[in-house]
């Protein structure tokens, strides 16, 4: 029987997707990071694990004469990603993809799938540890030529995880190479924008959304009672996000008639007044190896013409009320000071002049007026981030096979570096149906 090899990244998302498609564990899993191997072993105990540099694993010895049906490669993407910015890059790390050529030469996998960031096609020589713009893509073309020289047909595309059932817009580059004479196949999207005819007509399911991944039972503490006040940049993000996704939204997303949530990015500034955030009823933007997302909740209560009358006991579910103190005045002061102002100001300073708006923090929900009575914020949990990547809800992320706990930072890092499992499942089903179980893709 043909075996499956995964030179995986992060928490083992490709292995998970492959398992969902085939109904079996990958046979060989390779990663240099002990923490990544520990998480993989906890979830895929039947795999043979190599905690080594990919160049130190002998493909012939590892396979032991068994034919390879699929070899998956997720070489480190940090030194290709635009998120790297203008920082110097390392030639050795950028060259990790060449290990796929070694496997093609020595054990000739029937199908090779390589995953990376979209900038992978710009792979070229370096000058002073920076990409040489005059030779952009030169090394990538050599890489493709090497695969073809060993008898592989090659094709590549960029895909979005939300189109295959993951509640994130994460975009990735995929290269498929095969040497069995069969055609390379790209999976058809299963999900789409809910406003398009493809979805309204029933051809596709609607994108899964960020709202699905959030545990609404976790408290969201008030931004006004924190021991350490939030910095001005974060306050501006919150205010701009509330303005765009709640106050100015004709149809704000409301949870159980009690709160209006949104997500903000906790780092990464944009110029001007651009909002670094998103509505909760869209797929999550790309999650990286650090937790950049803050859940902001505007607690709302019915607004009466005579003014705000109650802190609203109904806000206790599904998120417990932040405090019994009336924060209405603080909410109004906050919105006045940070309502899209370019610089903003501290809440301890005198209020800016209130201009044309008579009321701040009023939200219209299905024709009824509500008022924001408090604002909470918390970071997304590692479990929520794994949910956004499309991992199964029972995927073990907080401990290894021996029960040793991982810190949250390690959990988030494994998540951000992982392949969303729905990608791998869809690609394997499209190209290796003979190895797959008969059920359709499980991504809802």
Please name every model-derived segment.
Residues 38-65:
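S-adenosyl-L-methionine
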Residues 59-70, 77-327, 332-346, 352-353:
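Class I S-adenosyl-L-methionine
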Residues 26-28:
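Short beta-strand element of Class I
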Residues 1-4:
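Extreme N-terminal starter segment of soluble prokaryotic enzymes
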Residues 372-408:
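FAD-binding beta-loop-beta segment adjacent to the flavin cofactor pocket
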Residues 33:
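Conserved SAM/SAH-binding beta-strand->alpha-helix loop
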Residues 8-12, 415:
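Class I SAM-dependent methyltransferase "Motif I" SAM/SAH-binding loop
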Residues 11-22:
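Conserved SAM-binding loop of SAM-dependent methyltransferases across substrates and taxa
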């Amino acid at each position: 029987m043909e075996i499956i090899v995964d030179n995986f990244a992060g928490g083992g998302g490709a292995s998970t997707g492959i398992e969902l498609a085939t109904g079996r564990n990958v046979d060989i899993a390779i990663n240099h990071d002990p923490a990544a191997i520990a998480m993989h072993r906890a979830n895929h105990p039947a795999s043979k694990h190599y905690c080594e540099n990919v160049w130190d694993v002998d493909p012939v010895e590892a396979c032991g004469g068994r034919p390879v049906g699929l070899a998956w490669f997720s070489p480190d993407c940090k030194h290709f990603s635009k998120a790297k910015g203008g920082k110097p890059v390392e030639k050795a790390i950028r060259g990790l993809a060449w290990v796929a050529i070694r496997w093609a030469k020595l054990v000739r996998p029937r199908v090779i799938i390589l995953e990376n960031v979209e900038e992978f096609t710009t792979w070229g020589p370096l000058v002073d540890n920076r990409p040489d713009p005059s030779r952009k893509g030169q090394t990538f073309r050599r890489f493709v030529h090497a695969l073809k020289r060993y008898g592989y047909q090659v094709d590549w595309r960029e895909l979005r995880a939300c189109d295959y059932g993951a509640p994130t817009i994460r975009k990735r580059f995929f290269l498929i190479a095969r040497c069995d004479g069969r055609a390379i196949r790209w999976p058809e999207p299963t999900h789409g924008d809910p406003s398009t005819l493809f979805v309204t007509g029933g051809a596709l399911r609607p994108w899964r959304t960020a709202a699905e991944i959030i545990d609404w039972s976790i408290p969201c503490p008030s931004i006004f009672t924190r021991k350490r006040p939030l910095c001005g940049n974060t306050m501006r993000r919150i205010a701009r996000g509330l303005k765009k996704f709640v106050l100015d939204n004709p149809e704000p997303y409301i949870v159980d008639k009690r709160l209006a949530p949104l997500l903000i990015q906790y780092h990464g500034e944009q110029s001007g007044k651009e909002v670094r955030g998103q509505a909760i009823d869209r797929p999550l933007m790309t999650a990286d190896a650090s937790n950049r997302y803050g859940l902001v909740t505007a607690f709302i209560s019915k607004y009466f013409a005579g003014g705000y009358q109650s802190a609203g006991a109904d806000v206790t579910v599904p998120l417990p009320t932040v405090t019994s103190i009336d924060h209405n005045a603080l909410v109004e002061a906050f919105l006045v000071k940070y309502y899209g102002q370019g610089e903003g100001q501290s809440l301890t300073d005198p209020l800016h002049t209130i201009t044309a708006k008579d009321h701040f923090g009023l939200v219209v929900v299905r024709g009824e007026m509500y008022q924001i009575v408090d604002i909470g914020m918390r970071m997304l949990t590692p479990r929520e981030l794994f949910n956004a990547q499309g991992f199964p809800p029972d995927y073990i992320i907080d401990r290894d096979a021996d029960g040793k706990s991982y810190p949250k930072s390690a959990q988030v890092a494994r998540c951000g570096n992982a392949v969303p499992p729905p990608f791998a499942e869809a690609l394997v089903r499209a190209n290796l149906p003979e190895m797959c179980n008969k059920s359709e893709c499980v991504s809802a």
